[in-house]
Amino acid sequence: MVNFTVDQIRAIMDKKANIRNMSVIAHVDHGKSTLTDSLVCKAGIIASARAGETRFTDTRKDEQERCITIKSTAISLFYELSENDLNFIKQSKDGAGFLINLIDSPGHVDFSSEVTAALRVTDGALVVVDCVSGVCVQTETVLRQAIAERIKPVLMMNKMDRALLELQLEPEELYQTFQRIVENVNVIISTYGEGESGPMGNIMIDPVLGTVGFGSGLHGWAFTLKQFAEMYVAKFAAKGEGQLGPAERAKKVEDMMKKLWGDRYFDPANGKFSKSATSPEGKKLPRTFCQLILDPIFKVFDAIMNFKKEETAKLIEKLDIKLDSEDKDKEGKPLLKAVMRRWLPAGDALLQMITIHLPSPVTAQKYRCELLYEGPPDDEAAMGIKSCDPKGPLMMYISKMVPTSDKGRFYAFGRVFSGLVSTGLKVRIMGPNYTPGKKEDLYLKPIQRTILMMGRYVEPIEDVPCGNIVGLVGVDQFLVKTGTITTFEHAHNMRVMKFSVSPVVRVAVEAKNPADLPKLVEGLKRLAKSDPMVQCIIEESGEHIIAGAGELHLEICLKDLEEDHACIPIKKSDPVVSYRETVSEESNVLCLSKSPNKHNRLYMKARPFPDGLAEDIDKGEVSARQELKQRARYLAEKYEWDVAEARKIWCFGPDGTGPNILTDITKGVQYLNEIKDSVVAGFQWATKEGALCEENMRGVRFDVHDVTLHADAIHRGGGQIIPTARRCLYASVLTAQPRLMEPIYLVEIQCPEQVVGGIYGVLNRKRGHVFEESQVAGTPMFVVKAYLPVNESFGFTADLRSNTGGQAFPQCVFDHWQILPGDPFDNSSRPSQVVAETRKRKGLKEIPALDNFLDKL
């Protein structure tokens, strides 16, 4: 089993230049877990015979059954580079042994919050792409997240065995396929990255540099251009140059790699490389990549799969492959696996690519610090993170909770960015709502134990220095999902993670047996801990609601709740979609509300946001924490706001960060600042529970036009102003043509050409519309992209499969909010049905009349 001890790992942990923290990310079913296996078996944790079948990192029973990864799992590997390979590393290094902390993450879009949590604690990412289906929606989503977190990508083209055996591609076609995938990935990187002048420099991937791997995870073989360049350099050197020193050799190999990709051709007649596709004699020359790399692979496949015994024996001898005695008698696919695995072992190729091209914590924390840390860029904590200093103050980010074997307890899983964490150390545990100088969300407690995560096992360890990934015992009572752990008194929080999906699907749950209610509540608390994304809400009516990213996500959550967290039988409602409320025009009257004691008056109007502003707020381009003038300039330039008004934004809401704005455009009002807090509180309340059906508001700008206040402070307290502000906000919404917004999924469907018609049928029935259709070049597959309301998406997958004979594979991602056409006050319209259903579910009466909110002078 594990062939190195905890002490050995601990010794390397101090060599922070030799640590690599990386995650494996990709579209669903592109083979992350299978590839991870070949890495794990190389580092001596699975017996190599079973690699490719165990999916070691799929630790849960349901992951093994469904063949999907649900939770991201961490594992530490140890790899030693040979002296020759060390010369390829361009950053600082310390000895030949490397510690690789690898996190296998799920590819299914419903679990992309798990990916976000994994990305936060790593510095590099291995992006896996299936070379048959190419770059998909989820590849793009995850890669975009990685680049936003300043994580350096390397690419792996997986499933080459399929390209050769199923699609039967020619070498040139295969080269074009690879070329296209590399281009697609680079387009995504350059779109979302910061360019070459940014702090990370150039992070584009390029086969010539060795940042692209090719291979097959299932068969356990892989290579980068470096492997072949080394073979050829050795071959040419054998012809008479004598021995090369390691550094010269590295230089030669790098030159060779440049010749093996792109428009470079090889003339087999005289063994020379040329840049033109025709030889001096006018013969058409083969591309070097096809001739020197793909051709030998094709020959091996051809000889073995067509049972050509003599040819196979010749090739094995020529390639110098040593087979075990039991492998010699195999034929067909088993022999192919054995030969390829011996000739181009996947573990070596990938681990070399990871150690050579991904950054160590020392390199990465320099440019990631400003994204990770909220405090000033020059305090002790920030300096400790930037220099990755084990003697600095402890700064550690907990990105998620991992359930232990013992019910209801969790390991806190995270990464040490600065300092040293050890068993028994007294630390400050800061939740996401902590603000420096306040007591809220802060605990001072000792750490009970520090442990090392090993896939399905944990190993106790004394202490862990910065740059490493670690689990803590005994912190789980004080944190819900994420948080910062530090020993520095004036430390600010590490920045909260931004999820690329939002929980839009909800289910109400109740215990079948009412006596089990306390267990259900306890179970919901544990569920909220164990999943970074899920929200557990208790409605005013006493309902327990679970909100998740989609059907599959909710299904897994409910199963966990029933079996692991609450351990009781549960009844669940049908899934319900959350809506948002908005307005479509400016209020047609200036709305006035008087306070209950009739001494104060507020005048307001509401109007809709310009297109794109709500999305900017969601992304954090415009936020409450920004510098005032900078924000005003942005709004004025991009959305043509009046600069004076843009400077007087009071707040965002709901929760102080949401996509609604309260601006003050009053002129010369007395005592205005004294009631500001009360109006803001009313605004937060109103935007959280809108006028139509108490859903959140979105994309509404409220303007305070005028305020008349009583001169005596006692008559304008919070009790007078807050409800008045809320009534006034409601009135201004109801007079501004209110509308409902529904969430929309972006659906990507992969299917053969002949079933495209069936897809259109299903989408039209479900109010979806197709906006792009393209053929995947070099394959008979079509990709259809469509928008589909989340409300209609339940059972969509099953419906689609039955209409296309199971040949279409849909993938849904939450994309945007869209206005539901129709007036909520017109009884025959769709929005009015939704409003009625929602109000009935929440136990509310019908929409109150405008007169309840609007007062006469």
Swiss-Prot record:
Annotated site residue numbers, Cleavage: 586-587, 605-606
Phosphothreonine PTM sites in chain numbering: 54, 57, 59, 435
One biological process term in Gene Ontology: translational elongation
Cross-link Glycyl lysine isopeptide (Lys-Gly) (interchain with G-Cter in SUMO) per UniProt, renumbered positions: 322, 529
Catalytic activity: GTP + H2O = GDP + phosphate + H(+)
In-chain residues carrying the UniProt-annotated modification N6,N6,N6-trimethyllysine: 525
Molecular function (Gene Ontology), one example: ribosome binding
Name of the protein in its database record: Elongation factor 2
Source species: Oryctolagus cuniculus (Rabbit)
Gene: EEF2
